[in-house]
């Protein structure tokens, strides 16, 4: 195996993080990105770490599993977390970012590193004799995807991700909406569009009957629950949306609200939330409204939402295939291929789901590729940490029922001793244990 540099294929969240981790350890990196020469169905730019779905990196508190994961990544000097904090926009208790500023930051930090060489080229085969991380994401080009399937000897799985629409803030009718975060956590960063029972019923019926965009050559519809199209939720039953993105709990009308309401009820029957999408607050996305309706149908149906009667859509919701590997059979916890030690995979193609989780996989793969380059022992983060629980889960779960996974406390190893009944107290203890463990690993492995 030649060891003059490490290849990273793909400059998304995982690839960018991996390249950064390798370069900061003094190892030359060649990062290949085809965007700029050839676009995917979902990306709009050639920038690194472009966010194509939501602009939220989810919960910030360490009593939330993804918040704990972000804190672990921060301590491991993650470029993705640095970018997110630098370009943060108001989002209550969540970490949301200005999309363009975020991608600009990552592109600049990675591509300007003196040990990083950026090559705009489509890779169509798997390098055999060089250390390589493949992090081409769920929209891997057909030619490389076929080589990966051929290499792994398995067809893998596939499903669809759906992105929510983005609207112009100036087109919102603020007489019918109010600002509030659920349970008044943090600042009142969300715009809430309340619905009466009659409005909700009409909206659900319109969603069910709306015409969907054709799925082209895509295969069987296998939707990951975390990014389910809103029209699919509507079809699942009357209350599915009320317990999902349109949940009204904790979003009571403010006393100063003068818009339409259901009688004297303090809480709306249903609520559609809008979340700030950029730093200037000129754009808002419709939270949880991923969709693959035809664009004309999106305008017709979503303008039924109170306050959005004249909404101008900056981007309509779109849907794309999202393929991932049979990681339980194909990968080690280090994100190395079981078949070829010098080959790593990272990002959503491994079955981790979400921006933060994808970046975390790139971080682990990057650290271990650097270890391998230097003839050092690779690092296996324990499942008592959030960053260790994900690779453990995707490599140890039942292959027959394997589906993409977000980080949750359910996959982090339980505390020793009697179970603490209070969730917040229990998760606080889990987070403390995790961060203490990580501190020891950082010191022992010289990972800072």
UniProtKB/Swiss-Prot annotation:
A molecular-function term among this protein's GO annotations: flavin adenine dinucleotide binding
The organism's place on the tree of life at top rank: Bacteria
Annotated compartments: Cytoplasm
Keyword field: Cytoplasm, FAD, Flavoprotein, Methyltransferase, NAD, NADP, Transferase, tRNA processing
Gene3D superfamilies per record: FAD/NAD(P)-binding domain (3.50.50.60)
Enzyme class, spelled out: transferase
Database matches in InterPro entries: FAD/NAD-bd_sf, MnmG-rel, MnmG-rel_CS, MnmG_N, TrmFO
E.C. code: 2.1.1.74
GO biological process annotation, one example: tRNA wobble uridine modification
Required cofactor names: FAD
Similarity comment: Belongs to the MnmG family. TrmFO subfamily.
Record function comment: Catalyzes the folate-dependent formation of 5-methyl-uridine at position 54 (M-5-U54) in all tRNAs.
Protein name, as recorded: Methylenetetrahydrofolate--tRNA-(uracil-5-)-methyltransferase TrmFO
Species classification: Bacteria, Bacillati, Bacillota, Bacilli, Lactobacillales
């Amino acid at each position: 195996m030649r060891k003059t540099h490490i290849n990273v294929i793909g400059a998304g969240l995982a690839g960018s993080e991996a390249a950064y981790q390798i370069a900061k350890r003094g190892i030359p990196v060649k990062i290949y990105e085809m965007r700029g020469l050839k676009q995917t169905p979902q990306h709009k730019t050639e920038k690194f770490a472009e966010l194509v779905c939501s602009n939220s990196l989810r919960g910030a508190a360490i009593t939330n599993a993804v918040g704990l994961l972000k804190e672990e990544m921060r301590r491991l000097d993650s470029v993705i977390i640095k970018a997110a904090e630098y370009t943060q926009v108001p989002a209550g208790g969540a970490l949301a970012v200005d999309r363009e500023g975020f991608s600009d930051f990552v592109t600049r930090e990675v591509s300007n590193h003196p040990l990083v060489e950026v090559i705009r080229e489509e890779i169509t085969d798997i390098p055999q004799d060089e250390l390589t991380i493949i992090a081409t994401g769920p929209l891997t080009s057909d030619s490389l995807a076929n080589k990966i399937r051929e290499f792994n000897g398995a067809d893998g799985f596939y499903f669809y991700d759906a992105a929510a629409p983005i609207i112009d803030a100036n087109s919102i009718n603020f007489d019918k909406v109010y600002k509030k975060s659920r349970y008044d956590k943090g600042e009142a960063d969300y715009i809430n569009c309340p619905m009466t029972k009659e409005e909700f019923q009409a909206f659900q019926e319109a969603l069910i009957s709306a015409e969907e965009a054709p799925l082209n050559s895509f295969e069987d519809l296998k939707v990951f629950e975390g990014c389910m199209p809103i029209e699919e939720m509507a079809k699942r039953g009357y209350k599915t949306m009320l317990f999902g993105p349109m949940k009204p709990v904790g979003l009571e009308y403010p006393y100063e609200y003068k818009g339409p309401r259901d009688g004297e009820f303090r809480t709306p029957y249903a609520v559609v939330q809008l979340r700030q999408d950029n730093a200037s607050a000129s754009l808002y996305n419709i939270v949880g409204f991923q969709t693959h309706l035809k664009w004309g149908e999106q305008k017709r149906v979503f303008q039924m939402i109170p306050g959005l009667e004249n909404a101008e859509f900056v981007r309509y919701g779109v849907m794309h295939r999202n393929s991932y590997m049979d990681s339980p059979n194909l990968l080690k916890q280090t994100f190395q291929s079981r078949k070829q030690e010098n080959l790593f995979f990272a990002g959503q193609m491994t079955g981790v789901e979400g921006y933060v989780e994808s970046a975390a996989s790139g971080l682990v793969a990057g650290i271990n590729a650097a270890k391998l380059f230097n003839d050092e022992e690779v690092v296996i983060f324990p499942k008592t940490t959030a960053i260790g629980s994900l690779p453990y889960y995707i490599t140890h779960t039942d292959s027959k029922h394997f589906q993409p996974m977000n980080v949750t406390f359910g996959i982090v190893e339980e505390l020793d001793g009697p179970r603490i009944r209070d969730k917040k107290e229990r998760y606080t203890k889990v987070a403390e244990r995790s961060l203490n463990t990580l501190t020891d690993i950082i010191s022992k492995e010289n990972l800072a």
